[in-house]
Design a protein with these regions (language model features):
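Cap/lid segment of the alpha/beta-hydrolase catalytic domain
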Residues: 148-251, 255-258, 305-306
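N-terminal Sec-pathway targeting helices
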Residues: 1-20
Length: 440
């Protein structure tokens, strides 16, 4: 190849890859949604059923005690009709800890690799590797942001010293490959890796694990993943991938909760898109998670079903049948028949702080529907006397609100402005991490 041809060939390769990613984006988001803009008035019919109305075998909820009595029924209904059961109980055990870099990121952080083993009551075990990044210039104990990575530790933390994963990952994940910058161009500069320096500078640690070690995002591999946990993948109540990821987050919390360098009440969940669904479910099930940063979670996350705006259940069940319970597909053509919806999921996290992120041109994720769900979930925070201040306009970000929504321009993805808002929100509620008063 002559030197003159190399730039041309490289350009053609990048254009070809970009076209491929554009096709992938169009498959995930219909073209008409790429030119639509979210309704910032968040208008729509009344959310039904109302959160505290009679139902689930109980009278109307009028007190905090009533609400606590209703919680188990709501969780059971969410598992049965949307997410599938949680995997059986297990405890995380540290097998080995390795110091990767004592002064990474220009001396800002210490990187460790932890090999974990999840031990079930029947003696069965599965392994999970994670990385912990500790800021060197912040006093401890530290709050920690938990992140599930689809590409592995090296890609998420931008250091080859963590090594390439053996488990399943998508083609755009290769560190230094051509696809990574294309993914960043289309889905945002932080879709594969968070702004590590900014997070460390704010005094937060990072805990990252490769999700595919326990739950690969592949329909063909999901049954095998469940079988490793001793589960029958053919039962109606088998865990969907979102449920499996949420369970893994709790197992990582088992391990982090034993590290005295970290705040006992300082576990913060972050997720984007499908992982944003999982962090909401994890926090709804496990009160150890003190805060949730959920970005563009869409259908099966914070957005309401049946709005007629975002991704319908029929589409998500056809494209990703392994994500949810088998029963969920039965609501594909009658979403309003679901006995539970996003406002129930959000309410189970009360009174802890939750940030919902959206984008103006990401109507497939239906940010207006997520905002309406947040307003419908407000009574749960009110019962805890934790709903003041409260964000009441979709286009006015109020980081001090316990359930807030941040909107930016653009499409589906993770941008620097998303992370600035998330860190501002975390800072606004940091005092809550210190006192740990978040009883649901």
């Amino acid at each position: 190849m002559t030197p003159r041809l190399r730039p041309l060939i490289l350009t053609l390769a990048i254009v070809s890859l970009a076209a491929g990613f554009a096709a992938y984006l169009s498959a995930c988001t219909p073209v008409r949604h790429l030119v639509m803009t979210a309704d910032m008035t968040a208008r729509g019919p009344a959310v039904s059923p109302a959160l505290l109305a009679p139902g689930f075998g109980q009278d109307a909820v009028t007190s905090l005690q009533d609400w606590r009595s209703r919680r188990p029924a709501l969780q059971s209904a969410l598992d049965e009709h949307i997410y599938g059961a949680a995997p059986p109980p297990a405890q995380a055990r540290l097998i080995a800890s390795t110091l990767i870099d004592p002064a990474a990121y220009g001396g800002a952080g210490r990187i460790e690799r932890h090999a974990l083993e999840f031990v079930f009551e029947d003696g069965r075990t599965v392994t999970q590797t994670m990385a912990l990044v500790l800021p060197l210039n912040a006093p401890g104990p530290l709050p920690v942001i938990l992140i599930a990575s689809d590409c592995g530790l090296a890609a998420a933390l931008e250091t080859e010293a963590l090594g390439e994963p053996d488990a399943f990952r998508h083609g755009y994940c290769e560190v230094g490959g051509l696809l990574s910058p294309v993914a960043g161009f289309i889905f945002g500069e932080h879709v594969l890796s968070p702004p590590i320096a900014d997070i460390l500078a704010r005094g937060y640690a990072l805990a990252v694990w490769h999700e595919s070690e326990t739950g690969p995002d592949s329909e063909s591999l999901h049954a095998e993943a469940l079988a490793r946990l001793g589960l029958d993948p053919d039962t109606d109540d088998r865990p969907g991938l979102i449920s499996l990821w949420a369970w893994t987050m709790s197992r990582v919390a088992d391990h982090l909760g034993a590290d005295d360098r970290l705040l006992p009440n300082g576990l913060i969940l972050y997720g984007h898109s499908r992982r944003a669904k999982a962090v909401l479910l994890a926090a709804a099930r496990d009160s150890r998670f003190a805060m949730v940063l959920s970005l563009q979670s869409g259908t099966g996350g914070a957005s309401l079903h049946g709005d007629g705006v975002g991704e319908p259940a029929a589409s998500i069940s056809q494209s990703y049948p392994h994500w949810f319970a088998r029963r969920y597909a039965g609501y594909a053509h009658d979403e309003n028949a679901l006995p539970v919806d996003a406002h129930h999921l959000l309410a189970l996290i009360a009174p802890r702080p939750v940030l919902l992120g959206g984008a103006m041109r990401d109507t497939w994720s239906d940010p207006a529907g997520a905002f309406r769900a947040a307003q419908a979930a407000r009574p749960a925070w009110r019962l805890h006397e934790a709903d003041e201040p409260w964000q009441t306009d979709l286009d006015t970000f109020e980081p001090g609100s316990r359930l807030a929504t941040h909107m930016r321009g653009g499409l589906h993805g993770v941008r620097a402005s998303d992370w600035r808002a998330m860190l501002d929100f975390a800072d606004a509620h940091r005092a809550l991490l210190e006192d740990g008063n978040r009883q649901p």
